[in-house]
Structures are given as C-alpha cells and as structure tokens.
Amino acid sequence: MALDIYTASAGSGKTHTLTREYLRLALSTPDPHYFSTIQAVTFTKKATLEMKERIVQELYRLATEPDASPFSGELTEHLHLFPTKLQERAQRALRALLLDYSSFRVRTIDSFFQEVVRSFAHELGHSGALRVQIDSKPLLQSAVLE
C-alpha cells in the first residue's frame, strides 16, 4: 500500500482533501471493515476530531442521501461504481465503523509515534509503560539537575 502525504497551509482545504482521500480508500473495496487498515495522521487533537467528524458526516450523507455529498460524483467516477453501489458501500462501511469505532484510526502524530514506540518497547529495552511528556519544563529541570 502506498503512503500518501499531503502538506498545506492553514485554511487551504486539508480537511476536505483528507476526507475525500479517506472515503476513496475506505469505499474502494466491498469490505466494509477496510477502514480499519487506514491510518490518518494530523498534528492537533482539534484537527483529529474535525477529521473524524467530517468523515462520519460524509459517510452518513453518502449512505442516506448521496446527492447531498460533495464527494458523491467524484467517488462514483473514481471508483467506477454506480451511485446505488456507492451508497450501499457507504451504508455498510458506516455501520462497520460505528460498531468498531476503536479501529477508526485518525490520530495525532504524537499518538501515532507513541504507538510505534510501544510496539518496539521490548526491543528497545523498555517496558511497555511509556508515557509522553508534553510539558517540557519538568524535562528541562531534570536535565539541569543532572
């Protein structure tokens, strides 16, 4: 699977682009659980929540009234699906996503790397009980004291 990276400045439509790409991937297969193989990473918790909300909102639109979604035409064309087939896939994917919400991986870059580090903790010689220190003040104080 390819790694797609999108970079853009504030207000340039990143959420729209990422939502479209997420939907394109999630609906590219008849497997309604395919969303669980997608990893979307962004910088802030606010952006993460906004992206999750937008993806669910658009999946709902595609599942209930596809003509109301700005992505409907583009997805039917790109995925080579009839509108009714796209709607069916959206219904099944939305249901699967809501029933297995913990597998809906849209996260911040720090939580992504925290998961990566945890998965290699044993190989790195650490216990799995690692925590991320966001406040740099205690870290600086500790460095000065040593």
Predicted region positions:
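P-loop NTPase Walker
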Residues: M1-E123
